[in-house]
C-alpha cells in the first residue's frame, strides 16, 4: 500500500545506519533522593506511553546532575523506546516544542540522521511488525530486556524522504484526532467526577440525608445452581463476560457456589486492582442473570436509580477508599477481609426525594452515554491507524 505519486523500491537499512545515537541514560547518583520539584525533566518508562510523551507524575533533576549525564540529554524529535520490563517496546517521538530533558536506564534514545523522519520510523516500532521484532530480540533468562547492539541491528524498509514525510503527516493527523478524542473523554469523566463531588458534599440540601447502604441495598444470597455464564468486573468495563474481557475463563469447573447477579445489582469485588486498593464497586447493566466469583459481594437494589448514583459515586477511587478504608482489614498477600454486612453498615450522604434520585441518575447516565459514543469513535480511530500500519509495514 502506497500513496499515489510515489514510485521506486524502499531501501532496507539497519537502524545503526540511519541513527546518530542509540543509547540510554542511568539512575542518577543518589537515586530518587536527588529528584526535585523543579529543574530538568527526568523521563522514565512510565512517561513513554500511548505513542506519546506523557508528563503526568513527572520528576525533575538539578541542572548539576543533568550536566553529569550529558550523553543522555533528550532533544525534540528523538525517538524514545522502553527497553526493559512490562512496558518494553513502547515508544514515542519527543515533541517539536520540547526544551530539555534526560532519561534513565530503562529508556533508549534513538536520534536519527538528517534524511530520516522520526515520525515515520516510530510508528513502525508501534506496529504489529515492530512489536514482534522487539519480542524476538529480548535478552536475559526472563527475556525482559533489549540491548543496544540488537536495537542497532534492526532492519527497516525505508522510502525516500518525501514519502516518509507523506506517511508521517498522515499518521500525525490520526494521532491528533486520537489526542482530541482522549481529551473529550477525559473532560466527560471529569464532569461526572465534579458533579458527584458537588452533590455528595452539599450538606445544606434538605432533600438529602445521611443513610447507611443497608437502607438502599440488600445482600443477594443466590447461588449459581442454574449455571449462568461467569462474568468478571473491571474498572473500565464494569460487569463483563470473563472470556470476552480476559480471553479465557478463570472460573472453577463447578460454579454452583458462585454468586448470581441480576440486572441493576451492585457488585463489590473485594480484591485490589490499580487505583482501587480496596476493590471495585459497580452496577450490573446486563439484562440477563450472570454469575460472579463467590468472593464478590452481590447486593440487590431497592431503587435502581439510587444504585445507579452509587455506581457513579464509586467510580472515583478516592470515594471508594474513603468509604472502605476504616472497615477493611488487609491480610497476607494484600488480601481484603470484609463481610457483606460490614459493607452495608457505613453511612453516606444520599438523596431521599424520588424525583431527584431519578433526575440525578438520568443526568449522570446521559453523560456516560455520551462518553461511550466518544470512546467508540476513539476505538475506530485506533483501528484505522492499526490497519494502515499493517498495510504499510507488512
Where are these regions (language model features)?
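A structural feature that tracks compact, well-ordered secondary-structure segments
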Residues: 1-9, 13, 155-202, 347-381, ...
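Sequence-specific dsDNA recognition surfaces
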Residues: 16-31, 46-76, 214-228, 234-266
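A short beta-sheet element
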Residues: 44-45, 56-128, 259-319, 339-340
